[in-house]
């Protein structure tokens, strides 16, 4: 009865890092620089792959889509966070909040599937090199990409549907850097236990599936590498695989902790720091880890750069 008589809230305050006003300008400048580098790096990678016909193969199609999704994740979260550093009003409407969460859920879930697909691609390329052209065709790659995006959309729709059942009447303070189902469920005056359960079941299943796929694929890859006789080749392959696994661990570690681990009833500072790994840091690092270490990408980028410099002069 109290819930029915209460005034329903339709606007929220995203606190973000605003509880430390003395850091407002330095944090704004830091995140702005990171965001600009992230967008330029990922869009630059997409342009290189798009322009060079030699890179129109599964490995680079997957890499280009990873760059697109990284730019998407960063653009979903960072602009609003930057605005909140400087704007007098930190409000976000309920509809805008739901749109931001929907975009975030699609992009993050799609990246989970993409990382698993990329690990499988590396497994086939290294463990079955002679069969690679027959197994990992462009047609199969495109189908896997479509499945990744469809999986992301369906997963987002599930949580968006359960988000619509929530009502808010007690507090409009969201202690987070973006609108997410868990912090919103914590301040809802509707019973949100089903929302937490859906997050655990669906988010947990997707993360476990993709992590297992990645670990199994790279385990076979590492065994295949150890059979090689070239010390230089082994060191290079270990370095590349290590960098990839480092990126994956930074991405999945916070995701598992937030969406699969037990949810604390009260918000704390960790709720804002951990999401920075998969919304800000990983989109910045992925172009470096997956591209600058790749000879074909760097050669194509150099050629494109030289061509544009000649045209400008």
From Swiss-Prot:
The keyword Cell membrane applies. It comes from the Eukaryota. The chain crosses the membrane at residues 29-49, 57-77, 99-119, 144-164, 196-216, 241-261, 272-292. One of its GO terms (cellular component) is plasma membrane. PROSITE patterns: G_PROTEIN_RECEP_F1_1, G_PROTEIN_RECEP_F1_2. Residues 50-56, 120-143, 217-240, 293-313 are cytoplasmic. Signal peptide: none annotated. Glycans are attached at residue 5. Keywords: Cell membrane, Disulfide bond, G-protein coupled receptor, Glycoprotein, Membrane, Olfaction, Receptor, Sensory transduction, Transducer, Transmembrane, Transmembrane helix. InterPro entries: GPCR_Rhodpsn (IPR000276), GPCR_Rhodpsn_7TM (IPR017452), Olfact_rcpt (IPR000725). It is found in: Cell membrane. Disulfide bonds join 97-179. It holds the Pfam family 7tm_4. SUPFAM superfamilies: Family A G protein-coupled receptor-like. It is a multi-pass membrane protein. The keyword Cell membrane applies. Residues 1-28, 78-98, 165-195, 262-271 are extracellular. GO terms for molecular function: G protein-coupled receptor activity; odorant binding; olfactory receptor activity. Odorant receptor. PANTHER family: OLFACTORY RECEPTOR. Belongs to the G-protein coupled receptor 1 family. This is Olfactory receptor 5H1.
């Amino acid at each position: 009865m109290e819930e029915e008589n209460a005034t329903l809230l339709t606007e929220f305050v995203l606190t973000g890092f605003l509880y430390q006003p003395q850091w407002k300008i330095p944090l704004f400048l830091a995140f702005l620089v990171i965001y600009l580098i992230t967008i330029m790096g990922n869009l630059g990678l997409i342009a290189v792959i798009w322009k060079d016909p030699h890179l129109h193969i599964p490995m680079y199609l997957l890499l280009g889509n990873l760059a697109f999704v990284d730019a998407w994740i960063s653009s979903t979260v960072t602009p609003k966070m930057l605005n909140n550093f400087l704007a007098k009003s930190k409000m976000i409407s309920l509809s805008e909040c739901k749109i931001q969460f929907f975009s975030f859920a699609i992009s993050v879930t799609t990246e989970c599937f993409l990382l698993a697909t990329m690990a499988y691609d590396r497994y086939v390329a290294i463990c079955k090199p002679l069969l690679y052209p027959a197994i990992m065709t462009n047609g199969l790659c495109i189908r896997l990409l479509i499945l990744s995006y469809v999986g992301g959309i369906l997963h987002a729709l599930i949580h968006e549907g359960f988000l619509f059942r929530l009502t808010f009447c007690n507090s409009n303070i969201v202690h987070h850097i973006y609108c997410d189902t868990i912090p919103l469920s914590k301040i809802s005056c509707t019973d949100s236990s089903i929302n937490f359960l859906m997050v655990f079941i669906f988010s947990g299943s997707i993360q476990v599936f993709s992590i297992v796929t990645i670990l199994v694929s790279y385990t076979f890859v590492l065994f295949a590498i150890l059979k090689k006789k070239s010390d230089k080749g082994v060191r290079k392959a270990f370095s590349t695989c290590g960098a990839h696994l480092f990126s994956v661990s930074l991405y999945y570690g916070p995701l598992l902790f937030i969406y699969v681990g037990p949810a604390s009833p009260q918000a704390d500072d960790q709720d804002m720091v951990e999401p920075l790994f998969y919304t800000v840091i990983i989109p910045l690092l992925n172009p470096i880890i997956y591209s600058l270490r790749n000879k074909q990408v760097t050669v194509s980028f150099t050629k494109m750069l030289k061509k544009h410099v000649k045209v400008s002069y």
